[in-house]
Amino acid sequence: MMLFVWTTGLLLLATARGNEVCYSHLGCFSDEKPWAGTLQRPVKSLPASPESINTRFLLYTNENPNNYQLITATDPATIKASNFNLHRKTRFVIHGFIDNGEKDWLTDICKRMFQVEKVNCICVDWQGGSLAIYSQAVQNIRVVGAEVAYLVQVLSDQLGYKPGNVHMIGHSLGAHTAAEAGRRLKGLVGRITGLDPAEPCFQDTPEEVRLDPSDAMFVDVIHTDIAPIIPSFGFGMSQKVGHMDFFPNGGKEMPGCEKNIISTIVDVNGFLEGITSLAACNHMRSYQYYSSSILNPDGFLGYPCASYEEFQKDGCFPCPAEGCPKMGHYADQFQGKANGVEKTYFLNTGDSDNFPRWRYKVSVTLSGEKELSGDIKIALFGRNGNSKQYEIFKGSLKPDARYTHDIDVDLNVGEIQKVKFLWHNNGINLLQPKLGASQITVQSGEYGTKYNFCSSNTVQEDVLQSLSPC
């Protein structure tokens, strides 16, 4: 259904309803270029009225984490009567197309924030404008962005709250909504996080139409669905539009999104949610990664690299001297370390059960009497826990040869205390040959710390060999 509405909204051609419409506290909106009548936006239309969109600001704080307080910019008394705290950072969470501000994913982000910080968390509900056909929803976000900007302006003018303390987090169309708000506030907003910004009607458009680095003092972006809308039905932008752009898993296919329709529907509550999750799984991963990053800051390190292909070939490791940024909630800790805009970072994640990953480079030197065909695996044992086995190499196993591979481990094992080695023979060998690891070096990605382990033993296939620090 979501797929149908998106594509229908792009292809329908409508007649112009006028050149401009104005609203008292929001200003005027035109249907002239670049807002409409372009190659990317063939539909000539104006945004719906503020009354029909009915943008609502749902305030959650550490004092009311479960029940929102409705605040309005046109009635500042509602803000003063609420738990809004002028001494805290304010984070807006803005949904996208055919979504609403009371969905669990928005409130879950707020609740996770409350576990790590004192914050004003405002979920922006604009379902009155998001449930339109896509081309109309694209226009409606201009009004929603204006409403967000107006609220921030009221906070500043009447309560002395600084826009630099505002962070806007927007998914899909919500990312461009945040951009509209930031543009109206002259880029004085502290931060905008774009969660897979919507591609249709925004890719390759002028900066004033879409998210770009000038919309806030710091703009970070997570790309999870960058395949083109035609023919791949990718909903997210491939274009780099932030100071820092993260491409987890290369930005196209997210682990766990390959499920068949039955298993996807079983995993969620309700048939409609199941269909939506299937059609937009990659697109939705962006806000799931962000939410997970709040409680797992070190599990989403982004490595600077020219391409995902180079990253996958064990390049771009470890982090450079200035370190690696953390994708998601803590990306702004790297602000100022990465000069310029459109800096590109790559990382891998897990599937729907466990997203964070910790990257290590493992080098194994073999010992034995003869060359064999098979595979070698290792497991890490650290102060914080033990990893499962990870394959390092498969093919011709030669004594004294060194095999190196980067692995993405599903937990932070901490300081590594020992390593276990396992090999398997792909052929039939009645002589029961032995093979071992004479040395294994493990390097962590974040700090480049190296751990060296040695052994003089060899073992038969499928028998664990334990290596201790050299």
UniProtKB/Swiss-Prot annotation:
According to UniProt, the tissues expressing it are described as: Pancreas.
Q: Where is the active site?
A: S172, D196, H283
Q: Glycosylation: which residues? A: N354, N429
Question: InterPro entries from the entry?
Answer: AB_hydrolase_fold, Lipase, Lipase_LIPH, Lipase_N, Lipase_panc, PLAT/LH2_dom, PLAT/LH2_dom_sf, TAG_lipase
Task: Enumerate the residue ranges of region (Required for galactolipase activity).
Answer: 94-106, 258-280
Disulfide partners: C22-C28, C110-C121, C257-C281, C305-C316, C319-C324, C454-C470
Name of protein:
Pancreatic lipase-related protein 2
Q: Which organism is it from?
A: Myocastor coypus (Coypu)
Q: What is the lineage of its organism?
A: Eukaryota, Metazoa, Chordata, Craniata, Vertebrata
Gene that codes for this?
PNLIPRP2
